[in-house]
């Protein structure tokens, strides 16, 4: 496990059975994620990892007049690789002291060692920085898989002609896409 107390993995805060969110009962109405010590709380709730691959790099959109994109709630990482490297070293989230400590944990798992050497070369563990970067690439590659972007919601099925919206859902869609500066779709983009 890649957390200090071996109590948490990426899937703890990004549960695949709950749309890759942190669905644990944490005593604060799920407003913040629990840390590795199962007592400390992070600054905020972990965002879903679903569809994160579609988030553009964090930037100011001059046409729209506001910032868009990035990873984490505040856009502080521009890539999935950058996002994957943050939580293991965050003192509350996973609490590991250093990249070396994370890499040493990876080396405890023979499957990881064999896989890393097969994919990244037999010398991947000779340099902790390179091995850590390889880990972030592996996690990001998984986050880019179809597992994280299933496109199987009612709305997705509606777009494919496989589902008819109820009158209430149709009204909600009209409000969501209303053509004004305060529409839901201004921030929650559903079409490229």
PLM region spans:
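Periplasmic c-type cytochrome electron-transfer domains
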Residues: 1-192
């Amino acid at each position: 496990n890649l957390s200090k107390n071996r109590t948490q993995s990426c899937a703890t805060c990004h549960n695949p059975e709950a749309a890759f969110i942190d669905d644990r009962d944490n005593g604060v109405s799920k407003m913040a994620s629990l840390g590795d010590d199962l007592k400390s709380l992070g600054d905020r709730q972990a965002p879903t990892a679903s569809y994160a691959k579609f988030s553009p790099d964090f930037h100011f959109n001059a046409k729209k007049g506001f910032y868009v994109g990035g990873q984490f709630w505040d856009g502080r990482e521009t890539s999935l690789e950058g996002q994957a490297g943050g939580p293991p070293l965050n003192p509350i989230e996973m609490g590991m002291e250093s990249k070396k400590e994370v890499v040493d944990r990876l080396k405890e798992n023979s499957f990881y060692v064999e896989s890393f050497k097969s994919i990244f070369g037999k010398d991947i563990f000779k340099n902790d920085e390179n091995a850590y970067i390889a880990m972030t690439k592996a996690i990001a590659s998984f986050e880019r898989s179809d597992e994280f972007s299933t496109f199987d919601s009612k709305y997705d099925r509606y777009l494919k002609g496989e589902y008819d919206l109820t009158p209430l859902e149709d009204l909600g869609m009209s409000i969501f896409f209303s053509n004004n500066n305060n529409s839901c779709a201004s921030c929650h983009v559903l079409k490229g």
